[in-house]
């Protein structure tokens, strides 16, 4: 198999789309990052793109926006993941992707480099195409603005520390600023006399968009705010798209149940793996 390094995100998307759109939900992260690289190149200071070609079709794909982890697609031919691990010469901090392809790449990379893979986050990937409405929750949804920036940065960092159990590669202020200014991203807040919860969205795919993070401070929990916020935001996004995606922490069964009640269904598991 031939592993090719590409430099043009538009060319990468055009070539990889037949593979990626076979399972749009599974590949929403790669599709969203590649679209951002194409449409808003200033958001990422650097990028690396790879395709695996078996002579007949694109059999595998991967991308990285340093210093973030590599993202891998599910291959359509045996050996594509291993070919990527063999041919990529750049140093990698880790790999993100659906299971089992992320695990397979981590194993191949460990065999090549001697580094030890360690799973830092086990996730469930969920998809929604119709919302089950939530009632009986006080408050209203509104779009966040620059006047909410400091609060959103505080909440974003709190989410990272609580849910991811480690510092994020992307600083909270950078993440918030991007979503407040990007064309196909945004942040919404649930107000109940005061701001009580927030959700962000972005990473557009041809037919969908990803929601996350969703965060409610501890003092405002167990009142249904996150459920109402996610349901209302999902409904709004489905006015212009067919699908919504989100990732959940598999160690938090409460949040998984909340999303299922709204109408999200689990597509697959995903993992973030670092190389020690």
Tell where the protein language model's regions lie, with residue ranges.
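Conserved beta-strand-loop-alpha-helix junction that forms the acyl-donor binding cleft
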Residues: 96-102, 246-256, 273-276
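Short amphipathic alpha-helix that is part of the acyltransferase structural core
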Residues: 1-30, 131-167
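Conserved donor-binding loop and adjoining core beta-sheet/short helix segment
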Residues: 3-9, 18-24, 31-94, 196-209
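Recognition helices and adjacent regulatory flanks at domain boundaries
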Residues: 189-191, 202-204, 223-236, 247-249, ...
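Conserved acetyl-CoA-binding loop-helix of GNAT-fold acetyltransferases
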Residues: 77-87, 212, 216-218, 222-238, ...
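Acyl-donor-binding surface of acyltransferase catalytic domains
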Residues: 54-138, 273
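Conserved acetyl-CoA-binding loop of GNAT-fold acetyltransferases
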Residues: 111-117, 260-269
